Amino acid sequence: VAHASPWVAAAALFAIGLPLVPSQAQVQRLHDGLARTPPMGWNTWNKFGCNVSERLIKETADALVASGMRDAGYRYVVIDDCWQVYRDTAGVIVADPQRFPSGIRALADYVHAKGLLFGIYTDAGTNTCQGRPGTLQHEQQDARTYAAWGVDYVKEDWCNSRGLTAPDQYRKFHEALVATGRPIVLSICEWGSNRPWVWGPGTGHLWRTTGDIEDTWESMLRNLDLTAMHQAVAGPGGWNDPDMLEVGNGGMTDAEYRAHFALWAILAAPLMAGNDLRTMSDATREILTNREVIAVNQDSLGTQGWLAEQPAPGLQTWVKPLADGSRAVALLNRSGAEAELRADWTAIGVAPGRARVRDLWARADRGSFAGSYAVRVPSHAVVLVKITPAR
């Protein structure tokens, strides 16, 4: 949600073209059975901001099913800021009765009946980013309320938090959620401003690494670069979060949106759609439901990909190891002109010899290649391939 946050220093490695070599950090992530793969779903904020309602959520749940997104893996339907208006005399948080006349419990029941999961938003401070009541000093009460409503996912923001310590506040809310006995995913949203990659594992299931994404090529790449710096801490039970998807919101071309989606897949990032699912184009739906690309993101190995090579400014090879021994490789052209990019077996960790190459956006086998695979990539685009060593 909109805020002013201190920026983390941009990745100097990218500026000078050095690859990021992953390290094997010993990270204690949560082992509660939740978020064993990156969470997938939909959130109101990017498209609708404060314009949220019961009708929107029901129609979106319907669209998740009708579009094939639910069956492709999208499960969480999340209401972001502005659903809440005040606390009653007992301190219980109250949903806007005009926008949610049936109440949140009934809405969660509707979402659950569609085979989906239900999420909600709060803030660790006194008020949310849009001035609604925050959860400060009501952590246990709010956790109990959400559990009683049937909430499966909570995004917790960091506005109006002056004087608070992020690790302590998020840990307190995590413990309150655990105490309810209901399995609830906790999404930590403090924009990467308190080094959540250090304390987020073991506290939440995902943690934002950046400020809010905008629906532009430049913003998407900025969030990619900042998130790539923390590759070692991500894995089953805890994920770096470069923010929600902008696919389908109109600020980028379809080729740029394919790159956005492919790179979030390589990053093992949460895939939270942020567009209007009721009116999306066929091209948008095809991006969001490409099961071969989703499979890269949801791979059971749970390794976040990294920048393997940058042979020239703006030309990058990103790689993600997969559980079956293959590699997903994104050949990314950030430059202003079409260029040839090459996936070199040595750089991406594939044994010398022949390997099969499949183009995941084209859904086409490209053949068997020895040592490397080269392809021309348009400006502001990606070619995403799966490279499988010959057995």
Report the location of each language-model feature:
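Bacterial N-terminal signal peptides
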Residues: 8-19
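N-terminal module-boundary/linker segments of secreted carbohydrate-active enzymes
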Residues: 26-58, 63
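Structural recognition of the beta-strand scaffold that forms the well-ordered cores
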Residues: 38-44, 73-80, 117-122, 152-157, ...
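Aromatic-lined carbohydrate-binding/catalytic grooves of carbohydrate-active enzymes
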Residues: 60, 64-163
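Glycan-recognition surfaces
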Residues: 138-141, 178, 182-276
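Catalytic cores of secreted or luminal carbohydrate-active enzymes
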Residues: 259-308
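Carbohydrate-binding surface patches
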Residues: 264-267, 272-274, 310-350, 380
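C-terminal beta-strand-rich structural cap/linker in extracellular carbohydrate-active enzymes
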Residues: 368-391
